A protein has these predicted regions:
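Acidic, metal-coordinating catalytic segment for phosphate/diphosphate chemistry
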Residues: 19, 72-201, 208
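Helical scaffold of the NTase/Pol beta-like nucleotidyltransferase catalytic core
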Residues: 1-47
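Short acidic, glycine/serine/threonine-rich loops at helix termini
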Residues: 6, 58-60, 120
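Short hydrophobic beta-strand that contains or immediately precedes a catalytic carboxylate
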Residues: 48, 203-206
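Histidine-centered divalent metal-coordination motifs
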Residues: 63-65, 205-209
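Active-site nucleotide-donor binding segment shared across nucleotidyl transfer reactions
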Residues: 31-71
């Protein structure tokens, strides 16, 4: 019975993960790419966003945000680092490629002064962002990748913490931004603590043939 349940759960996982990559397989690639971007004199900051930053078990594509005073040169440098089959789109502050490894990588250039707002916008799941923007509207604001606005006046943009707190929320860790009640809990001051990666010391469960 337990084996049957495990098989059914595995089938469900495969269906949900179709067209996606296991985090453990794609993370080293992203880590190396962001390090090379960060090491360039062209780029001030390079951070992976999206499901990579949320540490989802599977990843559909890769989003990387950078700040630079030379967007076009930074984009060309990025293209020199990746092996790609196709460029899906390219602009002054954006490029999207399909890599030879089989997944898409999007690079977005953001102004330094709004990097926090952009990082918040491109990190959360679609559902988290929709709910947060709707909450902002109810409070009389507009929220996008360039900041939190009251009419035409920008209220918050420099850091993610600043954006959340301006909305009356406590800071929500990236791993929690899945629209599973985290916004409501942050407003109420009841967000659960996230175990820091440095606190992990080993595997707490070992599977054997006897567990089936």
């Amino acid at each position: 019975e337990k084996t049957e349940q495990n098989i059914l759960q595995g089938i469900d996982f495969v269906k949900r993960s179709k067209g996606r990559w296991l985090l453990g397989n794609i993370y080293p690639y992203v880590e190396e790419l962001t390090r090379k971007l960060q090491d360039s004199s062209l780029i001030q900051r390079a951070v992976a966003a999206g499901s990579i930053r949320r540490m989802k078990e599977t990843v559909g594509d890769v989003d990387i945000l950078v700040t630079t005073s030379k967007p076009e040169k930074a984009i060309e440098y990025f293209l020199s680092l990746v092996s790609y089959e196709k460029i899906w789109g390219k602009g002054v502050t954006y490029v999207s490629v399909h890599t030879n490894e089989g997944f898409d990588v999007d690079l977005r250039v953001l102004p330094e002064e709004v990097f926090g707002a952009g990082l918040q916008y491109f990190t959360g799941s679609k559902e988290h962002n929709v709910r947060l923007r709707a909450y902002a509207v109810r409070k009389g604001y507009t929220l996008n990748e360039y900041g939190l606005f009251k009419g035409k006046k920008r209220i918050a943009c420099k850091t993610e913490k600043e954006v959340y707190e301006a909305l009356g929320c406590s800071y929500i860790e990236p791993e929690l931004r899945e629209d599973q009640g985290e916004i409501e809990k942050s407003i109420a001051g009841k967000l659960p603590s996230v175990i820091p990666y440095g606190s992990l010391r080993g595997d707490l469960q070992i599977q054997t043939d006897w567990t089936d």
